Regions:
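Local beta-strand N-terminus motif with an aromatic residue
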Residues: 1-2, 81
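Acidic/glycine-enriched edge-of-secondary-structure segments
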Residues: 51-67, 198-213
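Glycine-rich phosphate- or other oxyanion-binding loops that anchor nucleotides, phosphorylated ligands
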Residues: 55-93, 98-102, 149
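A short glycine/small-residue-enriched secondary-structure motif
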Residues: 44-51, 74, 78-79, 106
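N-terminal glycine-rich anion-binding loop in soluble enzyme alpha/beta folds
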Residues: 3-63, 69
């Protein structure tokens, strides 16, 4: 039997994981000296109190899981005689996968007949979630692991996310932009437009002055490179930024019709630790990243 895994950095909750047929790995963060594992140390994520702390100047950190924790997740599956397919966030964004590989090397010696497969979504949060949705669909249709992996090889780069943040200081803290760029960008209202490239790394592709122009930029990109977007999930993810969501949805309906279907999610606190409050992204099926 094949057992599906994903993680909270793909913005999957325990409830959604159960609906889609996944076991869920919790990716931790630390805030004010307290280590927290989403949906292990709390049942539901309440975004507003978390992001209010960040607005008041609290700077959280994230850290990698250790090999022992990965063993705790994977060994019971192997011991039961099952194989694993893990759909995860970008391996280029974290050292946690080094720890995972250490654990897997040990487990392969102990359970040599068992198989471990992985799909690197080369994304985070809503981009990864979109791929999690599609893999679940294929699995429930009875596709073999080889068919699912072949699909991923062809399709992962056909899901893309474009996003921006109103406060660049959190990207500065995580090393994504320089201190000077963060200071002046936030001061004069410049919103760099960013995306996840085919290597799973965050890149800047432009900049806009003001919230509404940034929202329009995201929708314009979807018009330009979107591919059968309404046959797949259109996902808007945000960090306690309802005003931005409202502006984006208004423009989305202007360009794609008032009946356009979309999903809005709260970005998880581990990823939110890096982008801060008032960040937002748009994910869709595309011709390219």
């Amino acid at each position: 039997m094949l057992v599906l895994f994903t993680d909270t950095d793909c913005d999957v909750s325990p409830k959604l994981a159960e609906e889609l047929g996944y076991k869920l790995i919790s990716m931790p963060y630390e805030i004010q000296g307290k280590s927290t594992r989403p949906f292990v140390d709390f049942e539901e994520f309440d975004p507003h109190p978390f992001y209010e702390q960040l607005r008041k100047g609290v700077l959280p950190n994230t850290y990698a899981l250790n090999p022992y924790t990965y063993r705790e997740y994977f060994e019971p599956i192997f011991k039961n005689g099952d194989d694993i397919l893990y759909v995860h966030f970008s391996s280029a964004m974290s050292g946690t996968f080094n720890a995972m590989n250490i654990a897997l090397d040990e487990l392969k010696e102990e359970y040599p007949e068992r198989k471990f497969y992985e799909i690197d979504t080369r994304g985070i949060t809503l981009l990864s979630l979109n791929i999690v949705y599609e893999v679940s669909k294929l699995y429930k249709e009875g596709k073999s692991v080889e068919e699912i992996l072949n699909w991923a090889e062809q399709e992962v780069d056909h899901f893309t996310v474009y996003f921006f943040a109103e406060d660049l200081n959190f990207f500065k803290h995580s090393g994504r932009v320089s201190g000077l760029a963060a200071f002046f960008g936030t001061l004069i209202g410049i919103r760099p437009i960013m995306f996840m490239d085919s290597d799973g790394k965050m890149k800047t592709c432009g900049k806009e002055h003001g919230r509404r122009n940034a929202c329009r930029h995201l929708v314009n990109v979807m018009k330009e490179i979107g591919d059968n977007v309404q046959d797949y999930h259109i996902i808007i993810g945000h960090t306690d930024f309802q005003e931005g969501v409202d502006a984006l949805v208004e423009i989305l309906k202007q360009e794609f019709g008032k009946d356009v279907k979309y999903e809005v999610i709260d970005i998880n606190p581990t990823i939110g630790s890096h982008c801060g409050p008032n960040a937002m992204g748009l994910c869709f099926h595309s011709t390219k990243r």
